[in-house]
């Protein structure tokens, strides 16, 4: 059953050449499906390294599949399975002796010669974008290759034959109007699967026009060559009407083809492309391109392309071709009459020669314009015709493939995902596209690339159902719904009822994606593949809690156990005291039994880590993590290591990225060493900066107090700038210091209110409020100058209490203050140890990195847009890739050049 126009293999008698040609074979009994040509994989022992052969795939054997005769002397003959994943293919070099060959009908039985995919007479095409990923197509003009071998180099043969698989190009629809080409590696594999589908079923079940239903003429196109073959009239999408039964249906299973770096799969039976690692409602149409529009190299609709290809073969098969795509064809066809014309539904095609084909619209307006311009002396083609090209401008080769993925990045979203379903997928696509541009520009010498995978955890959560929506008033409903879909996620996470659901949702999705990626890339872990996480907004906090295992319920129970107050026994009776003693003894006994039980459980089963992988880099973008840590009692330490907030055995490197006007972002460095509140964050380089200074070589700079508004008066201004190893003298800083102040204000809210009320209501019984306020301000200044003392040494004397006769308010404030200063010691005793030489300690690595503001950027407008501006930023993409590729250049013997 012949399917002309479907790229069926060509025979050497059409080539004008004898031996040494190339094509494919699948088995001798499959030849009827391809009009005499079938495909197989041949392993040639001791192959000639100079024969120019390029292997396409290692083909899996199927029982009962007969191979081409005359090939019994070879080692392996394997049946075709074009849909194996990348790791199951064996793309061995020509030196290994493996090659993909095609045997035409009649020559395989007689021991005739075969033609390789790249014959020795034609040098292989050299791609201009050979360095780097190549997972995305790019415009034809940017991806056009240098062709060698003269005018005959465009086509493998000098006569008209069926298009070869390397001349056909598959496309996917990037938007509603634009088709984007698959890279050569992907296109060859899709074409191989498509031809396998043709030879098993006779046609594609779900094909045709991607934007509508396909309608095929029952009679097919008129044949100008006089041939009246029903099979030749088939458009390629309709089932054959010859009555032949499909062959080998049981032997070949058409599996999806992995494309675009393994992120997507193509189902040739449905003509669709869909993502592997995330859900997408709209499937992506794919199309097989044979005829292309001049200039843009966009493919004609598949229905019209199939009809034109069939008509072209019927009229010009075996005739000489002269077209050469290396030279611009500017030869005028004025005065030339069309040698052949073919009518389509809305257009018609004129052939002025074998390789001069023009498409004309048959719309009324086009006909009128064509008539007028022709009367003015213009040719028909130059006035309204569109030149068509047969075969894609760039031949597909196996070398045009994406580089190996050695580093994956999970991109975690924050709040607002419920409001815009699938937003994280679009944001990750923007970040991936920005990273591809940066890789081509700055990391083109790398043979590997970084892959970004979106982590969508919000849509699978149930939470309260629609309870919050049911209690929402109808007035300004749009604003309320927006708040319910965005800011409500913060309240859910702070709720002890729903927090675990959010944590488990993200944890399970991270582990699912990692397991799926490793199953599709088995050598990822063996070759030392690394994993990083990029989190945004609230996603930073949830990711941090998953990695560290922070549980507020468990910590609260520990706090209650350590802070349990003994009742006053002075007014108890003897019987009450006796019962209380028995209660304590019983509790102690119960605690011992619980500890023994936990010990037995711990010895019998080991606790599995929350994540199945170690995080190499944890990037926080627009992160409020510092505020959450401050509210949990984290205070500056004395080690200068990120272990103070995130141990290195959990995550190798923590990096905090923020825009200076992002209202949600806060600094992390002042939570490790307090005096870093006076040191500015590291400025992130612009992506187009030439020869930027490496981040580890950048010296620290101080925040300019003159440019930052403060609440201190002129008399309290500081005239000198402290050294980087001294504690800050300013009473309050714009950066960093607000973290501690906000944390203290949130935890001691009740104490502050009580203190304020005590000062206002009872100041008449003590000192004046003016004196009190002045002394309080002075004491506050002194506290800022002092290093942070350990909670055990902190007493009520360190701060001025309201001096009044209100014993109740003073006592309440004292107790709340004492609880606050003891909280870090109770929860994190290892993080509050201080050193007298605290001023000499510096950070091992910088953590806070700040994007540069635009020269004409409005800060007020930027405050609205900056929180969501990270995804498409090329500066952020360059920063991420700089640290992800850094491990390839690290030298263990190299001294640490980080200044702080």
UniProtKB/Swiss-Prot annotation:
Compartments, record wording: Cytoplasm
One protein family per Pfam: DDHD
Compositional bias (Basic and acidic residues): 776-787
Domain DDHD: 611-886
UniProt KW Ligase keyword: no
Modified residues annotated as Phosphoserine in this record: 8, 11, 723
Regions of compositional bias (Polar residues) in chain numbering: 710-725, 791-801
GO biological process: phosphatidylinositol metabolic process; positive regulation of mitochondrial fission
Gene Ontology MF terms in the entry: metal ion binding; phospholipase A1 activity; phospholipase activity
Region of interest (Disordered), ranges: 1-28, 100-152, 202-233, 706-725, 768-801
Span of the signal peptide: none
Family (UniProt): Belongs to the PA-PLA1 family.
Disease: Spastic paraplegia 28, autosomal recessive: A form of spastic paraplegia, a neurodegenerative disorder characterized by a slow, gradual, progressive weakness and spasticity of the lower limbs. Rate of progression and the severity of symptoms are quite variable. Initial symptoms may include difficulty with balance, weakness and stiffness in the legs, muscle spasms, and dragging the toes when walking. In some forms of the disorder, bladder symptoms (such as incontinence) may appear, or the weakness and stiffness may spread to other parts of the body.
Function noted in UniProt: Phospholipase A1 (PLA1) that hydrolyzes ester bonds at the sn-1 position of glycerophospholipids producing a free fatty acid and a lysophospholipid.
Record text on subunit structure and interactions: Forms homooligomers and, to a much smaller extent, heterooligomers with DDHD2.
Name by which UniProt lists this protein: Phospholipase DDHD1
Source organism of the structure: Homo sapiens
